[in-house]
Design a protein with these regions (language model features):
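Nucleotidyltransferase catalytic core that binds NTPs
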Residues: 1-228
Length: 228
């Protein structure tokens, strides 16, 4: 997940699901978590990241967002719409989780798309894994200082890592933003779960019931996704 805008069109969101108890316009200090990804497919780890961040950082809503067009690659196993169906199914029990498709795929563009959808007072936290967090911080931006300044003017980062440990590289360009980069420890049972493992198990004809919500496992079985 990288961050510098490359498109001329204004970033926008296509809503799939609005959280029944999400952020409202009259909240004084609302906090929004944003979890972007391909969700190919959604797993217990994705949901645990969102739920843990919401609890630890008092997030009033977590928005799951998929890019309409990926900046680096496209999943071959499932279409955007198929992944949206699985994700919407997984989010149904969660009244503070929303779902949208972003017209653009880069982090800063997603932040720009939020501006027209949420109150100006909302504080935004992007939720990322440790690998994505490292890429965001160390990406070879054309103008790194300017890009990082614009990013952290719009959002903080919550970085999920093993044991809640996060090592921020000692680089002068990152020093002003250390207080905006927050470590988060995932539940131990979710740390080894990934969409890659789910797909590998399905191709091998193995069970995935402990890796994804039951309704997602059932939908995948019915559709035959990821089996070849």
């Amino acid at each position: 997940m990288a961050c510098a805008p490359e498109h001329s069109a204004r970033p926008s969101l296509r809503w799939v699901r609005r959280a029944p108890r999400g952020i409202s316009p009259d909240e004084k200090q609302p906090r929004l978590g944003v979890l972007g990804g391909t969700f190919n497919p959604v797993t217990h780890a994705h949901l645990a990241l969102a739920a843990t961040a919401a609890r630890e950082f008092s997030l009033g809503e977590v928005l799951f967002t998929l890019p309409a067009v990926l900046p680096h690659r496209a999943p071959e196993e499932a279409t955007l719409e198929q992944r949206l169906v699985l994700l919407e199914t997984a989010l149904e029990p969660h009244d503070r989780f929303s779902l949208a498709v972003c017209s653009h795929g880069l982090l800063l563009e997603m932040a720009q798309a939020l501006a027209s959808e949420y109150p100006e007072t909302v504080k935004v936290y992007f939720l990322v894994g440790s690998d994505a967090g490292e890429r965001i911080l160390l990406w070879n931006y054309p103008d790194a200082e300017k890009t990082l300044a614009e990013m952290f003017a719009r959002f903080d980062l919550i970085v999920a890592s093993r044991a809640g440990q996060l090592s921020i590289p000692h680089q002068p360009r990152l020093e002003p933003y250390r207080r905006q980069i927050h470590p988060l420890e995932l539940p131990a049972e979710c740390q080894a779960i990934s969409a890659t493992v789910v797909r590998e198990r399905l191709r091998a004809g193995e069970a995935i019931d402990e890796l994804v919500p039951p309704e997602v496992a059932a939908a995948i079985r019915r559709s035959g996704l990821y089996r070849r």
